[in-house]
Amino acid sequence: MLVQRLGYMRSAVVGLLTMTAGCLLFLPASTSGLFVTFLGALFVLASGITIIQVVANPLISALGEPATAHSRLTFAQAFNSLGTTLFPYVGAILILGTLATVNETGLTGEALAALRAQEARVIDHTYVGIAAALGLLAAVVWLFRNRLAETRRPVTNPLASFALLARPRFAFGALGIFLYVGAEVSIGSLLTNYLMQADTLALPAQAAGERLAFYWGGAMVGRFVGAWLLRRFRPANVLLTVAGSAIGLIAISALSTGLVSGTTLIMVGLANSIMFPTIFSLASEGLGHRAAEGSGIICMAIVGGAIIPPLTGLAADLTTLRGATIVPLLCYTGIMAFARYCRVHVLLSERTESGNAPATELA
């Protein structure tokens, strides 16, 4: 509804300014020291990020030839992964820094209050800097707000967007995003404990946690490479291949031990790389002016990251960590089925256009 009312560029400005406000809300949150105030600031920040996701994904898909939309979106998502890989370290340096070495045990009265004040100042300075950068970016986007020719459309009931789920291809794609995010977060959540197991790598907690960077870093590298691959191969075929690879890697990891078991599960991050942008673009094909509505529904589907990990944890409690990998494996099986569906749809469309088969409406 926001995009219908304001257009893509102005909606992007709203998203950036919402993120800026969220960052600034960390100032009173750090001063109060109350957890609920941090949650409020985080909620506002996350709302702005969601607006940017809803706006940016269909916008990037539309800026160029439809045939290369998958590649463009994958390339853009690579920078998302770059931030995910780098900024935890940057944040640790900026926010934790020397504070991580301070032991609060035994501190009371003025000494403890002074430490808390110092912690608040560190948080304030970090988030003020981020807010300034976001505000500057919002100003730049605002200056170029009229560079993109947009046709404003009447604002419709937000619930009308769910009518898009009547399209089998779009509904299947939204389910694919749900499964993908759930599987990715599930593996990322259990990987540290998985690598600590005696029959895997038997690593101490810190070393196992450090290996987690390779899992998320694999997604970054894979997206840069995937942007090139998607210009040369059919997106549905590439998605089919990486989903099958993820299934194979999880199976090998669960059935093996030692270095092979640990390495293959980490490598699933590489297989994850092109899944989100490719599923998104395959599901959104043909939506036209309703692309922003579809983007909103797909962004809602990332709730899989909150639902599937607890199911994976339950499976681990009932069996073992190795047994719990069946949950993400089943998720990737669903993604593989979506890729197969899209592949068949493309082949039927090509035959229809060449006059070798009757028209079939699958999307």
Which residue ranges define each predicted feature?
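C-terminal ends and interior cores of transmembrane alpha-helices
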Residues: L17-S32, G244-T257, R340
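Hydrophobic core of transmembrane alpha-helices in multi-pass small-molecule transporters
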Residues: F35-I52, V260-I274
